[in-house]
Structure formats: structure tokens, C-alpha cells
Amino acid sequence: MNKNSSQHSFLRTIILVSTFGGLLFGYDTGVINGALPFMAEADQLNLTALTEGMVASSLLLGAAIGAVFGGRLSDYNGRRKNILILAVLFFAATLGCTLAPNVSVMVISRFLLGLAVGGASVTVPAYLAEMSPAESRGRMVTQNELMIVTGQLLAFTCNAVIGNVLGDTSHAWRYMLVIAALPAVFLFFGMLKVPESPRWLVSKGRKEDALHVLRRIRNEEKAKSELAEVESAFHKEAEMEQAAFKDLAVPWVRRIVFIGIGIAVVQQLTGVNSIMYYGTQILKDAGFETKAALIGNIANGVISVLATFVGIWLLGKVGRRPMLMTGLIGTTAVLLLIGVLSVVLKGSPALPYVVLSLTVTFLAFQQGAVSPVTWLMLSEIFPLRLRGLGMGVTVFCLWIVNFLVGFTFPVLLANIGLSATFFIFVLLGIASVIFVKRFLPETKGLSLEQLEQNFRAYEKTDRNSAEAKVSG
């Protein structure tokens, strides 16, 4: 094996191992959909509507907090060490959920699981972005998105299989939940074999260690030039002293934070998680029987995985802006069709099949365009010293909106119906398209350090034009 192929092979190992954090993210957010009905039984946790909501949403609340603290901890401990800690937390919280004797233990365990999910949603993309060469960063970072949707598909499939095979066993939900312990073990032992991010090593003054890591994943010339680029960017950022929340108020950084929060919120306002969490309920409302709805939900998981493959391929060919715009226009148009046809075809035997085909189309746009661009851009727009903190803040906003969508969707569905609920998401989708068109910069093909220079230059241009207007 020559040196180049050895470097590529090691880079592939790094991607595979670290993205098991994404697999856990996907499985743990998707599994609750099928586990709740079994968990709610009188001889199990005997859930009421309120406690059911608490069990489902406690993970999302934990994820919001985990995103903020996970970002700060990854800046302090390093990306690799942070992922190792998260793997232990994934494992312990999974066992807590699996063995929960009552609602209180379940809610606390789900909250702890959420901390791990939120921490992984920040740390893994940042680690991948910092290990990636600029020309293939898009494909590498979105491997994590692929693992997230694979985890969700795995959850939907396991729910269906266990629900049918062990459906008469009241503790079937415990088998659904415990499966997540296996990838947590793989993540922990796998991360022991991969190196720390060279960019983080530079930030801690460990230049020789950083060069050693870069030589394992780049050729000699690229390793040295990339190290020089990283050092140059870090020295510029060092003027800001230690990263703190007040640094996010620096004008050029404030613009990045605004764009980052906007991207995160836009990704959730499509309503994607209303389908991922309540897909079975949507299909039942459209007219399917429960078993048919469960099978339909697997179709949603399959299309998510296939579309993510397409999205990863597209990121190497198409700019971030046009890809996100196309995805948002597509999701908004599909939701409009669901809203209209749910009224026009109400009571028709064709309606459930129409709604299923439209949810599949919606997820093709979402997972093939919107989600890959979201996670990639969040990982690449922030400067090195603020990357963990910046991603933490933006992903915190993503999880809070996720929590609000997940919490309000079933309430809206029960009170105003399927059509009106989706019309609300259509209006939010139109607002999202306007935001992207107005504010989103193109980042394709630029190194992380070049992106930072562009943001700094934008601030100078903005300031100069403002001064010219005043003097004029």
C-alpha cells in the first residue's frame, strides 16, 4: 500500500469511527416513536398524555443544553476527548433508559441522553471539518448527516420488527432502547485509535503534534502549508484573548452568529421533525391503519438515507446557496400540496397513499439538500477559537426550535387538523427562503481560514461603505 492510499484509508477510518456519534444521535431521536406505546402500558411505566410528552421531549431539552456545553468543553478538552466522554454518557444514559423502573428515572435518563446527543451534534461535525482537506470537506462532514438518518432508519426498522415479533411482551420497549448501547461501545473504543484535531492542537501550542497528525492524513507539502495556514489564522484570533460569549459580539463574528442561528432555525422550521417524530401519526390521520402506518414510516427512513447519499454527492458539485434554496423551495411546495390535498381528497381512499408519497418527496428535498448544507455550514463558518462556542450557541437554537416543533405539532394536529398545521409550515418556509437569499454567503471550495478572511473583509467593506455614506 503506498503512502497516499494509507492516508486516505486512515481518513476513512476517522470518518467511520467519529460518525458513530451521528448514528447514536439518529437512533436515540427516532426510537421513542415506536417505544412510547409499549412504555405507556399500565404494567410498564403507565404513562399519561403529560408524562408521555415529558419522556419524548426531555431528550430535546437535554440536547439544547448539551449543544452549548458540548461546544465549550470541546474547545477546552479537545474534540477527540470530548467524543470519548460523550460515548460514556451515551452508554450510561441508554442503560438508564432501558432499566428505568418509573417515569422519573426515564425522564432523567432521557435528559442525560439528550446531553450526549446535543454534545455530539456540535463536536462531531467540528472534528470532521477540522480533519478534512478543503476540497472534500463537504463530503466528509455530511457523512455525519448520513449516519444520523441511518440511525433513524435503524430505529424505525427495529421498532417495527420488535413491535411485531415481541409485541405481546409488555417490556418490548426495553429491547428497542438497549440496542443503542452497542454503537456507544464502538464509538468509545474507536475514538481511542484516532488522533486529536490538528487545529485544536495548534490552539494549545502543540505545533509538532499537529504536524504529526496532518502528515498521517495529508502529503508532506499539504501538511506543512495547512499547518502554516492554521497557525496564521490562530495568531489573528489570539488578539481576542480566550474565547468567551462576549467575543460573539465582535461585529464580524456577530454576523457569523446571526447567519449560523438563521441556518439552524431554518433547518427546523421546514417541519422535518414533525415527520420524523410523528410520521406514523400523520399517516394514521390520513387514513392508514396502524400496521400500514408503521411500514410507511420505514419508507420515510429509507428515503432519508438514499437522499443523503445524493446530497453528499451534490455538495461536491453544487454551491451551498443554490442547494439550500432548492431544498427549501421543494420542502415548502410539498407541504403546500399536503395541506391542499388533505382538504380536496378528504375521505378519499387515495389520500393516505398521496400523503405518504408527499412525505417521501418532502424528505428527499430535506435530507438531500437542506440538512447536509445545514450541518456542513455550521461546522465551517466559525473561526477556530470560537468554533466550539459558536456551534454550541447555534445548535442550542436548533434544538430549542426542534423542541418547540416537537412539542407543538401534536397539539396543532389535534386542534386545527393536518391541512392548517402544514399551512403554518408553508409560511415559515417562505420566510426561510427569503432569509437564505438575503444573508447566506457561498462557502464552497474555500478553506476554513479563507472563510474567516472573507468574513473579516466583509466587515471592513461594510464599515467603509457606511463611512462613505456619512461623509457623503
Please state what every model-predicted region is:
Residues 223-235, 358:
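Short, well-structured alpha-helical segments
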Residues 217-219:
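Short helix/loop segments within enzyme catalytic domains
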